């Protein structure tokens, strides 16, 4: 595995963790909070963002405007039954979701969830590292690399892994500050 492949795979892991962070509620309304909501539409689970446009008219409200007005009630039901704890307000054309301020207890829960997502990201990074080191060891065993070259490449893989883990930890710290900010 070349260094650019290694970095690309690790970058994907960090980006996936970042997307998970974006689904965690902070005190502000954000359309990405609804990213994981699927709507039962014509017998198929369809992502909400493919059925409606999502916007934030102000810092405490998310507006959901369906492309097909026939899906309005289905979207409202999907939001109401999600585990996000939102109560959708349907005015016949647009669904408005008021995002209430977070309690201190809820903020701590979201910090724990962010830490869990960060740990999952680190596990993914370590998996990429393990695959890269296994390939290096295989090349050494086959005689394509000397023992010194193998050790140097393994050290380089470890340094790259450490850099990406530090980046993940920075993203986690930033998210925790964002969550805890009142």
Swiss-Prot record:
Looking at the UniProt record for this protein, which Gene Ontology cellular component terms does it annotate, in alphabetical order?
cytoplasm
Q: Where in the cell is it found?
A: Cytoplasm
Chief subcellular location equals cytoplasm
Pfam families from the xrefs?
Answer: RRF (PF01765)
Q: Which UniProt keywords apply?
A: Cytoplasm, Protein biosynthesis
Please provide the Gene Ontology terms (biological process) for this protein: translational termination
Ion transport recorded as keyword: no
Chain intervals for the UniProt region annotation (Disordered): 136-158
| Gene Ontology MF annotations | ribosomal large subunit binding
Task: Check the record and name the NCBIfam families matching this protein.
Answer: frr
Q: Which family does it belong to?
A: Belongs to the RRF family.
Q: What does this protein do?
A: Responsible for the release of ribosomes from messenger RNA at the termination of protein biosynthesis. May increase the efficiency of translation by recycling ribosomes from one round of translation to another.
Q: What is this protein called?
A: Ribosome-recycling factor
> Per the UniProt entry, what species is this protein from, by scientific name?
Synechococcus sp. (strain CC9311)
